[in-house]
Amino acid sequence: MTITQPDLSVFETVESEVRSYCRGWPTVFDRAVGSRMYDEDGHEYLDFFAGAGSLNYGHNNAVLKRALIDYLERDGVTHGLDMSTTAKRRFLETFQNTILRPRDLPYKVMFPGPTGTNAVESALKLARKVKGRESIVSFTNAFHGMSLGSLAVTGNAFKRAGAGIPLVHGTPMPFDNYFDGTVEDFIWFERLLEDQGSGLNKPAAVIVETVQGEGGINVARAEWLRALADLCERQDMLLIVDDIQMGCGRTGAFFSFEEAGITPDIVTVSKSISGYGMPMALTLFKPELDVWEPGEHNGTFRGNNPAFVTATATLEAYWADGSAMEKQTRKRGEQVEQHMIAITEENLADVKEYRGRGLVWGLEFHDKDRAGRVAKRAFELGLLIETSGPESEVVKLLPALTITPDELDEGMKTLARAVRETA
């Protein structure tokens, strides 16, 4: 693909230096549909990024767009804080009947604010309020958001440094396979909890991702998650699952923890919950934990009614028929894995490991700079992918769940070419 030099002057002179994704994809995007994006010069890109997991159902999904347009054309409420609205009522009823009841999940639903970090902050506040303790345990290579409370339970040194102040009341523990299987699961964590001389303040909660997306696509085993849930119960700690990126079907089931057969005390959901890429977040928790006072946690944009509309349409279109979406995602994941095997076999000396679940996959190289070169070459070839991991050493794939088998093959072949051409 030949890409003419776009006019980026206004972005470079007016927009802050903090911008990041646009540096890896130096073009000006204009429109998008399904798994395709187009820049202002008409160049086409296959999207294996999906808004960092916010577009599980593709760009401008026709079913969701129609529901949104109809709502706006009848002058439906757009901004409602936490007022009761018809859009919110329909979402809550649909979410309860389509997602919660079939899974026997009794959760109360809280709208904490428009983003994932709002959900995490509210989860941490609630856990501390319920247990009367300050400390939260997180895991190595975790990522939970960019506000101060979320950063305190995030592992990435670069992102933590941006806080500019000490990040306290968070203690990291080794994630699954952090020691490459040489140390028994939770032996360190459990010893610290039981030893009165360890210096570890008893935690109010433990927060975990079942698959660490920003941390490098580190996949926790189901048995590890079950053991963690058991440890939390025995030690009187709440279990918080951050399902912001891995929920909404990304790993197969609607909630990523379903495979492990656990029921977390608190769950954070965002990104693709609106289905259309609009800001929306949920904090779910067991009814006995609902000890909030009215207005104790709030936010101006927590009642994004257009997002409620598209979220409802998403649940009705993709999750009302039981396990069809889950089965499709698992099948697409098997398709990706076959390509990953082929790429690995072709580049045995270069590829350290591939790993993933459902439609989230990572490809790690021995050369930590290789992933960035692969992503750059992929962009030049018309494929949008990002990197993850503490040193951006992993190529990260997040295609839309609605991607077709042919598009998936096309993207994986482009990835294979990018790997080959950056050797």
Curated annotation (Swiss-Prot):
UniProt-listed InterPro entries: Aminotrans_3 (IPR005814), Aminotrans_3_PPA_site (IPR049704), Dat (IPR004637), Ectoine_EctB (IPR012773), PyrdxlP-dep_Trfase (IPR015424), PyrdxlP-dep_Trfase_major (IPR015421), PyrdxlP-dep_Trfase_small (IPR015422)
SUPFAM superfamilies to which the protein is assigned, alphabetical: PLP-dependent transferases
Superkingdom of origin: Bacteria
Annotated metabolic or biological route of this protein: Amine and polyamine biosynthesis; ectoine biosynthesis; L-ectoine from L-aspartate 4-semialdehyde: step 1/3
GO molecular function, one term: diaminobutyrate-2-oxoglutarate transaminase activity
Plastid among keywords: no
Keywords: Aminotransferase, Pyridoxal phosphate, Transferase
Pfam family, one: Aminotran_3
PTM sites of type N6-(pyridoxal phosphate)lysine: 271
Family per similarity comment: Belongs to the class-III pyridoxal-phosphate-dependent aminotransferase family.
Protein name per UniProt: Diaminobutyrate--2-oxoglutarate transaminase
Protein species of origin: Streptomyces coelicolor (strain ATCC BAA-471 / A3(2) / M145)
Taxonomic classification: Bacteria, Bacillati, Actinomycetota, Actinomycetes, Kitasatosporales
